[in-house]
């Protein structure tokens, strides 16, 4: 199948934002203007095309990132809609992994919000070029210039306006395009009657000031333009666009534009910006991975290269079963062909290939380099797996997902539904890597764990709707961790003699605190422990670390060196050394000043001035640590770190304290030591 558009005309981009910044509405408008939708879907009435799960339509928030294909000015756009709610950071993470660029949507009255920061950091991690769209310019309290300064202050991003608004709040009429030096004014609510005019006299001075600042910023990123600028020569529109594109792709500049998606003002200009300034698959570095020998390998975005693709999302479709959303980095994937899942070392048959438009689909014979689509019929592929050619295998870097911070016990309302619930939970866990489920061996209860209360609410809701399993849910439990504070040396000998073959294992370890992942170092010399038993000691330590000695929580941030030990010619076995390893770990931990850690949430609360004292007092009583305050549009924004255990039911408490006028958002930030009194309380509760 011949390409409809060449690779340099592809734009794979995501729309990322804080909840309620108007991300889904913006995507809907893009689909409207690119000619796919005839009637615009509104999130307000639950009819939005992108929000295709029932729960999303009811709650008005986007949960599943749907990949949608559309066309604009001879370019193919693949849009990934990402959720802005903190409990769904995993969706954002996995979509950023496969994007080439992104549009960050800000709410004109709030600027940068907590989730904007989280998403921005994730985009930094993957080096995703971004442009900034300041939405809701028609809302009361809208302030474009304040928004831009929040990007500079809080995100430390070089935000450069390439438009400035004409009017704001109910008088928002359009914008001045600083590159072309014209005013764009809207005369209707569908964005159809849009006229280019001379810049109004009262804006001439401001436009001149911001245009000069923009030209200087673009020139700073390009040596040739800098020379022209310093010589006082005129820089042409084409040169400005080319310079801005180069600087945006290099992450040196974040171009800023404005609009109101709901009022259909500025969306077409934003799509033009995506085409003009965000990268094509040819503008980004070759994708890196390793071959089967573990050596570094890379693939360029070209149809002639061997196939390499990443399955970035698994979804269950009511009609066709399992869909694997996939980004093709190089080569061509054809329906009916066989490929290698190099992550799992298994051969897979590509069933049907479809391009997704929100939740309708168009079947295609092949997906080429740079394209995004969904594969039907894969048996063994899960999120983060690489699909590649069998002749030239490559394993692309997989994705990292955060561990859950909250868990609840769950049971079906009828005994008969137990098996059905187990199968449903397994299916949901396959779709969402931050959702985990297991059985508590002591109580026999099924436990589900995720990134927040809303995350688990939606899982329970999906069990009921999609799998027809109604459940009773226990009280939420915090995922505490344990760690150590000092370096120690400890040993353990496991010896059993009872006629016949005995058991013997002896290990001496040094254990110390460390930042980051668990490290095991083998420092045995002179064969004190035979090589084949070393991994058993490591396994014993890792298994024992799943149940710390304070309250049975997972132990993190420690390093172990196996320094000495002894063995018995006849009685030693892997099992004996595994037990010795786990005993040595417990002995070491009891001496190493163990402490309990709890998840700390970054909380941002917006309240009217008159409730501030009461709300701050309440945050302090929840063991919160104030980080700062800021007055925004007549309200106070309070920032603090608060332990997750103190935040359950906070929404209700805040509502009653502020007569329903306070709002808050929170996102997991880090783990911190628990005060002694709380540690004793948690350990006591666990022992009951």
Swiss-Prot record:
- Any one cellular component term from GO for this entry? cytoplasm
Q: What is its main location?
A: cytoplasm
Q: SUPFAM superfamilies from the entry?
A: EF-G C-terminal domain-like, P-loop containing nucleoside triphosphate hydrolases, Ribosomal protein S5 domain 2-like, Translation proteins
Please state where this protein is localized. Cytoplasm
Known CDD domains for this protein? EF-G, EFG_III, EFG_mtEFG1_IV, EFG_mtEFG_C, EFG_mtEFG_II
Q: Which UniProt keywords apply?
A: Cytoplasm, Elongation factor, GTP-binding, Nucleotide-binding, Protein biosynthesis
SMART domains according to UniProt: EFG_C, EFG_IV
- Single GO molecular function: GTP binding
Q: Which GO terms describe its biological process?
A: ribosome disassembly
Annotated ranges, domain tr-type G: 8-282
Specify which residues bind GTP according to the UniProt entry for this protein.
17-24, 81-85, 135-138
Family affiliation? Belongs to the TRAFAC class translation factor GTPase superfamily. Classic translation factor GTPase family. EF-G/EF-2 subfamily.
HAMAP family recorded? EF_G_EF_2_B (MF_00054_B)
Name the UniProt record assigns to this protein: Elongation factor G
